[in-house]
Amino acid sequence: MQFKIIKAWKVEFIKNNTGDGGAMKEAFKQLKPDEIPIHSFTNKNGRMWGNTSPKNLLKMIEKNKGLYEVIHSFPHKVYFDIDKHEKDENHLIKVKGIIQTYFPDADMAVSGSITEEKTSYHIALQNYVIHNEDERQTIKQIAKYICENEEDSFDWKVYTQNRNMKLINQSKPNKPVQAIIENDDYKAHCITCFINDYSLPIPINEKIEVEIQIEKSKKDDILT
């Protein structure tokens, strides 16, 4: 049998039972319109994928279950993944200032961890939303521009379909927990659900627009 079913936390998870993979795609086949896909990675069960309601997700993330959101479809909140490879307790001030420059009036929910070796943050914006692939590529180019010109702790490679983003109060096996830093509302930290009906338009300055057009021309050259 290619897959193994594990029932946990009111979710039926699918786990690879062979080296052929495919558990994530199998979970997507069972995804209902009112559910979101999730991924769990623990020492006990390894990697497994499933689907749950946003309401149940809030209960699940109260304790560490190694849970991740799988960013599988649109819409979802604009998010940033920040990784600085040293301890810097003041880094968040700089990062938030940069985000506010590109996303005026951004309402942020911040989680993360700080160790002697690394400073990490996930930042979800409550009032900026990605509705389609073009907007996702725009956010990617903004993050890339920031990384290359202003602050290299911005990870611009996290804007892909089926990207796994660690949820609050969760951790990889034997790693620091993704702790709430700003905004105590669990809903605010979820990227793929609890999305506001109203959002601000994604602003694009001239420099970013040039980068977007260059990237599009590269893709057009590949297609032709």
What are the residue ranges of the model-derived segments?
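Short secondary-structure junctions
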Residues: 38, 105-110, 179
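Short small/polar-residue motifs
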Residues: 64-66, 103-109, 153
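Histidine-centered divalent-metal-coordination microenvironment in nucleic-acid enzymes
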Residues: 75-80, 106-135, 162-168
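Helical (often loop-to-helix) elements that flank the catalytic cores of nucleotide-handling enzymes
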Residues: 87-102, 119-154, 173-193
